[in-house]
Structures are given as C-alpha cells and as structure tokens.
C-alpha cells in the first residue's frame, strides 16, 4: 500500500462522481426500487459500471463487491486476501431529492479489516482518502489544498456532535440517539459524508443502530476514520467482519473519534439489535 494506490482509487472515484453530476442535473430521473425504501437509479448503475471497470483494469485479480453488481459476481470473495467494497452512489435518496448529500465510496479490505478508503463528494468536489498506517487527507481541488485530517480530541459525549441518517430514522434509532445526551445530533445524508465528518473532526461520532447499512457502506469510512485516529465497530463494540456470512451490518454501525466510543457503546447497550440467527 502506497500513495500511488490511493491516487488511483481517488481517480476512479472522481470519474464516477463526475458521471453522477452529469445525471444529477437531469430534468427527470426514473427511479426503481430494489425493496421498500431502497431506490436505485440509472446513475447508481452507471457509476457502478465505471468503478468496477476501473478497478478491474487497475487492480486485476482483486474481487470487487459493488452494491449494484449482480450477486453472482461476488462469488469467491471470501477466499481472496484483498477485496474492494464499493458503494457507487451512497445516498441515493438524497441524490433523488437533489440536496447534495451523496458520495462515491471505494474501500479495500485485507484479511478481515478495512485498510484503505476513498469518499468522494461530487457536489463539492472534495475527496477524503485514507490508508491505515499512512494517514488520512482531505483533497479540495477548488481551494488547491490537500490537507491531513485527524479526528477531534473531545472525550465526553455531552460535548460531542453526533451525525445520523437523514432518510432512515426508525423509532429505535431516535430513542438511541436521545439516550446519548450529546451536545447535538445532526441529520446528514450518506454514510460516507458522515464518516468523513468524523475523520476530519467536524463530528465526534456517527451512529446507526439498525441493519439497513451494508459492508459497502462501512468499508471506506472504516479505513478512513481508523487512519485518522478514530474507531469503527458495531453497536456491541465488535469490529466489522468483512468476511462474515452476510453483507448486512446487522448489529448496526458506530463510527467515532475513539475517545467517545466506549461511552457511546455503553449508552447504546439497551438498543442493541437482536442477535441474528
């Protein structure tokens, strides 16, 4: 893993982001549904195709598990040492609403842990990249800046800013967020954008107690936040297992600056989802 690897991922994510922007301004955007509350558009599929093709060309032999690919293409990824997890349009509902809160995410797993991640925000042009052991950066082409990022030093939940889903707000999540007693809880679309806010110290944590997110929602921000000095786990404190039997984050997702993590887990203990059978 080196800087050139991250630059290649950055380029692939950026190209997909530009393709999304071309469709973002379309007068109409037909929407299909994979399930209740789970929309998909031609933009999702176009970005998915561009990323998968780009990764296959740049890194042949590394399997790609991408949200809009056919599940049959995932076959064998459990046995591979390295695997890419891709969300080609993270925040489809926000894309449809045109509020700007969506991202492109590419993450790399080695063994069982996320080691590299890229989160690209097409509307602002900002990209966050990180690799465990190398560090994390915020790249802002418009400002001509590439700056290292680090999680915040706030160590009390009462002084913390928490970000949570804008579009997926269950009663259980609302109760869990209220139980934290944080300084503020802010709604924000896109798991990637929420994770990026934690990585650069704008927020102290991102909390999701449900099972709606998948491994491709977690992988890039897992690597990014870890590289920036934070911590990522499920609501029980266990690391995300990218080689597990399911692609769903069935026990939720907690992304933090690390200093507030244990306190958040303790407060969430009453809201832990039932153990999957």
Residue ranges and their predicted role:
Residues 106-196, 202, 250-277:
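Acidic beta-strand-loop-alpha-helix segment within the catalytic core
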Residues 1-89, 175-179, 238, 259-277:
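N-terminal subdomain of lithium-sensitive/metallo-dependent phosphomonoesterases centered on the IMPase/IPPase/PAP
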Residues 80-122:
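Glycine-rich active-site/cofactor-binding loop and its immediate structural neighborhood
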Residues 20, 44, 55, 92, ...:
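Residue-level signal for inorganic ion chemistry
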Residues 34, 67, 165, 188-190, ...:
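Conserved beta-strand termini and adjacent loop/short-helix elements that scaffold enzyme active sites
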Residues 1-11, 175-180, 195-277:
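Oxyanion/phosphate-interacting regions
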Residues 76-78, 96-100, 130, 245-246:
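Short glycine/proline-enriched turns and hinge-like loops at secondary-structure junctions
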